[in-house]
């Protein structure tokens, strides 16, 4: 089997890229820099499964935990639930974090 220079070059580049990816990827247990977050940025918005219409600045079609979200002057919108996570703090700082981890096996193994 005959190898030409281009094939050898491709193999060398493949090995170099693989080596670079393995030596420069994050490793379990490595220190990751924590970014400071603004509580106003830590939010979760989820669709409530309903549409709504704003009439005279009010909407009664959304459920209790949802709000009507519309664009500009368009009276038609969607119901969304907004959760602010910023006030909850870092869960890893909670002294009871170890109690929150599963202590028993969650999934049962198939029996033969």
From Swiss-Prot:
UniProt region (Disordered), positions on chain: 89-112
Signal peptide: 1-23
An annotated GO cellular component: extracellular region
One example GO MF annotation: C-X-C chemokine binding
Localization per Swiss-Prot or TrEMBL: Secreted
Glycosylation: residue positions: 51
The keyword Cell inner membrane is annotated on this UniProt entry: no
Role noted for this protein: Salivary chemokine-binding protein which binds to host chemokine CXCL8.
Protein name: Evasin P1095
Organism per entry: Ixodes ricinus
């Amino acid at each position: 089997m005959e190898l030409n220079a281009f094939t050898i070059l491709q193999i060398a580049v493949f090995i170099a890229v693989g080596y670079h990816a393995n030596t420069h990827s994050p490793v379990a247990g490595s220190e990751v820099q924590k970014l400071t977050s603004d509580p106003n940025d830590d939010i979760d918005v989820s669709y409530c499964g309903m549409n709504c219409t704003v009439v005279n600045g009010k909407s009664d079609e959304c459920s209790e935990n949802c709000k009507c979200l519309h664009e500009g002057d368009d009276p038609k919108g969607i119901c969304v639930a907004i959760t602010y996570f910023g006030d909850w703090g870092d869960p890893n700082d909670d002294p009871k974090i170890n109690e929150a981890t599963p202590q028993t096996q969650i999934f049962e193994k198939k029996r033969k």
